[in-house]
Amino acid sequence: MKNRTWKQKVGLRFAGTLLLSALLIGVTACGAKEKQTSAPAANASSTSAAQGEIKLPETLRIGFISANNNKTITGPEGWAQSKGYLESELKKYGVKEFKYFNFPNGPNLNEAVTAGTLDVGIYGDTPAINGKAAGLKTKLINISQINMNVWLVAKPDGPKTLADLKGKKVATSQGSYMSRYLISLLKEQGLENDVKVLHLLPADGEAALARGDIAAYAYPTGFGPLILKKGYVAIDEASKHPDLLGTSLTVVTEDYLKANPAFPKLWNDIRTRAVKEIRANSEEYFKLYADGSGYPVDVVKASFQIDQWPEEAFPAKGLTLVNATKKFLVDQGLAKKDFTQDEWIAK
């Protein structure tokens, strides 16, 4: 009886073990099958969750420079704007309203940042650096354009060389990338004490030249080739002095960045897509730029090359130009205080 009981116990334990093993195999197989069929859904869910974690404010306020008072951005951001995805991509993260503000020059844009009426600014390196040096709470999120030319223009019967400017008046937009070029150029030529530099917006330059109020005007892209087309002459260009070429920068306010740390990547992803597209569709882009700026297409083509818009946010050439501009402004006392480039870049 005891022997039979022992055998029964062994049999029961063995049967139980077999049953447990079968159950484990079944569960494992079902789990594997379930995991295989549900994996894509889990990935899609995590992507949606990642998007859901980024929530931008409902209104985005963007400032940019338009010497002709046009309402359309003209760089790669303008391309993305015209194609609709500048807004559609950011709407995925909660933005519902886009406000665009155009300014005649950089210092005016800085004033708007100071007043708290902008979140993002796209403008020249000199006003952006001067603003930061003066305490403007901005962070650099990309170098949008590099190697921007300047044309120092005079009347056909006016000065022919830089030396001819001695004792005369010249003009440009104060606080702009053109002003940095002009002041640097005069210093290089030893003329900084013999030439008076006046503040004048590009739109007013031609009339001042025609009246003889000034001997030359330092024009930005667009305006420079346009005025040359009318018969004026360039006695110098920034392209002859590679260190004096300008850059266009994009900044975001520190308050906006602190509340929305993912914004720089979202913005730069849109911009990179736009740059790739305009490189593949340069003729269409030149026409779009012409329509947005009011300049003829041939003037737009004479103003810049497509590769002046880098795909990456911080190209080495751009960083070198920005740092050189900052150094000049600080050395000349034009920027209130120095700061490191690294501390300015949004991390």
Enumerate the language-model features and the residues they cover.
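C-terminal motif of bacterial Sec signal peptides marking the signal peptidase cleavage site
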Residues: 25-29
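Short, low-complexity, disordered segments immediately C-terminal to signal peptides
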Residues: 31-54
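Extracytoplasmic "Venus flytrap"
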Residues: 48-81, 175
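A local structural motif
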Residues: 56-59, 89-102, 117-119, 188-199, ...
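Secondary-structure end/capping motifs
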Residues: 67-71, 258-334
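Short helices/loops that flank or line small-molecule/ion binding pockets
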Residues: 107-118, 133-135, 166, 188, ...
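Pocket-lining segment of extracytoplasmic ligand-binding domains
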Residues: 126, 194-290
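Flexible hinge/capping segments at coil-to-helix
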Residues: 154-170, 256-262
